[in-house]
Amino acid sequence: MTCGFSRADRSPYHGPVTSTVARDVSGVRTYQVRTYGCQMNVHDSERLAGLLEAAGYRRAAEGAEVADVVVFNTCAVRENADNKLYGNLSHLAPRKRGNPEMQIAVGGCLAQKDREAVLRRAPWVDVVFGTHNIGSLPTLLERARHNKAAQVEIAEALQQFPSSLPSARESAYAAWVSISVGCNNSCTFCIVPSLRGKEVDRSPDDILAEVRSLVADGVLEVTLLGQNVNAYGVSFADPALPRDRGAFARLLRACGEIDGLERVRFTSPHPAEFTDDVIEAMAQTPNVCPALHMPLQSGSDRVLRAMRRSYRAERFLGIIDRVRAAMPHAAITTDLIVGFPGETEEDFAATLDVVRRARFAAAFTFQYSKRPGTPAAELDGQIPKAVVQERYERLVELQESISLQGNQALVGQTVELLVATGEGRKDSATARMSGRARDGRLVHFAADDRVRPGDLVTTVITGAAPHHLIADAGVLSHRRTRAGDAHAAGRRPRGVGLGMPAVGPPAGPAQPVGCAS
């Protein structure tokens, strides 16, 4: 669906405004991409940046307030994401009036949901595009400029797998790799399946080709992305045969055979799809990190049933027990929702009990957000805000104490860190650098000026807090890497997908490396 809207005076702001649009010194139009939401959106934003650079735009200078083109890649999971977007759009309205050549585009899940309503709430927006057609952005910008009319284009199904598009990667040392898009589950609180569509999987050959290309550019760590990664393979399975649930485990093992790939992570698995062969692949593949992020959402079986989460608390805890039996030092994290409609104090107590038993390294805890269009929004028993807030605070307090105890147990241990940038907000004040341990924990450490983001160091943990570790005893070893060289030189892997000509069964050559059925 494509619509054009006339460019009358649509801004509610009047009067002269001095433009601060960041035009490149060479006259090239500049861009910014502002991202809300999950890792999938972060990776999609790399694709949007790659598309714009391929079309001749240049990223605005660091610290520039605005650019010639500002793209919002949005989230629709929580109400505060809506409010934040429309608030930021309002802040840009006077700048837009001061420079009519400036363009504003809104994409992602909220755009897929709101469609033309984006223009009704923010009529100074130039382009609205959805989750299925991010490759259309440069064309839509040009069409809006030429026609002097806003363009709304929302596709109802995936037009082109995002990983086949150009990419401007944010990191020289770590990369996202999509293995699937969409979701076949029907959780009552979640709007994502209606916005991202049914699950569509890439073939193993295409995924491994992209990973090899990234490693050739110096990348040390990849994170395999999907709404439900351990359902991988469902879209190219033969419906006439029994479901083969081993495709994701084989993909992990195949990543283990790629020389130069030091770390493999993945997010997020669904407990109902979690099989023992994935645990075995994690434990037996040296470069697969001992880290698991698996959403629990609630510890109450009654609430899980109302959420349409097709597992129960004991099954979830059983998976954790088997993971820890295979990898005793694995860091396990989760997502939790407080205040789902109908949640009683007894239900909440069940969640607290599971959290105590699970001993998560960390938990991303959310207050239930009522989303129009989801079954949960129509349920009776919506919980008063004050009750939700009180339960939320109790849960956070419990989890923070568990996280602190787990981190304190690591004091004195030696860890390997992949040095990162942007992870430590106080690094400049504390003269520390930051990095991630193999289990995903954040460590702030004392280093000298020879250590660069992208390098690997070992150090000893000397202190702990709920959300990070401290290593002030100095660096024990330092390995300079090609990723560190690339970061120092300002180079990023381009990461163009190496062939996503179709979504479907893997080609024949995948079988020898363990990914074909």
Swiss-Prot record:
GO molecular function: 4 iron, 4 sulfur cluster binding; metal ion binding; N6-isopentenyladenosine methylthiotransferase activity
TRAM domain boundaries: 408-475
Superkingdom in the source lineage: Bacteria
InterPro entries tied to this protein: Elp3/MiaA/NifB-like_rSAM (IPR006638), Methylthiotransferase (IPR005839), Methylthiotransferase_CS (IPR020612), Methylthiotransferase_N (IPR013848), Methylthiotransferase_N_sf (IPR038135), MiaB_methiolase (IPR006463), rSAM (IPR007197), rSAM_horseshoe (IPR023404)
MTTase N-terminal domain residues: 29-146
Catalytic activity line of the entry: N(6)-dimethylallyladenosine(37) in tRNA + (sulfur carrier)-SH + AH2 + 2 S-adenosyl-L-methionine = 2-methylsulfanyl-N(6)-dimethylallyladenosine(37) in tRNA + (sulfur carrier)-H + 5'-deoxyadenosine + L-methionine + A + S-adenosyl-L-homocysteine + 2 H(+)
Keyword set includes Nuclease: no
Residues the entry annotates as binding [4Fe-4S] cluster 2: C183, C187, C190
CC per GO annotation: cytosol
Keywords, comma-separated and alphabetical: 4Fe-4S, Cytoplasm, Iron, Iron-sulfur, Metal-binding, S-adenosyl-L-methionine, Transferase, tRNA processing
SUPFAM superfamilies found in the cross-reference section: Radical SAM enzymes
Cofactor note: Binds 2 [4Fe-4S] clusters. One cluster is coordinated with 3 cysteines and an exchangeable S-adenosyl-L-methionine.
Main location, first listed in the record: cytoplasm
Subunit structure: Monomer.
PANTHER family: CDK5 REGULATORY SUBUNIT-ASSOCIATED PROTEIN 1, MITOCHONDRIAL TRNA METHYLTHIOTRANSFERASE CDK5RAP1
HAMAP family: tRNA_metthiotr_MiaB (MF_01864)
Assigned protein family: Belongs to the methylthiotransferase family. MiaB subfamily.
Function field: Catalyzes the methylthiolation of N6-(dimethylallyl)adenosine (i(6)A), leading to the formation of 2-methylthio-N6-(dimethylallyl)adenosine (ms(2)i(6)A) at position 37 in tRNAs that read codons beginning with uridine.
Protein name: tRNA-2-methylthio-N(6)-dimethylallyladenosine synthase
UniProt source species: Mycolicibacterium paratuberculosis (strain ATCC BAA-968 / K-10) (Mycobacterium paratuberculosis)
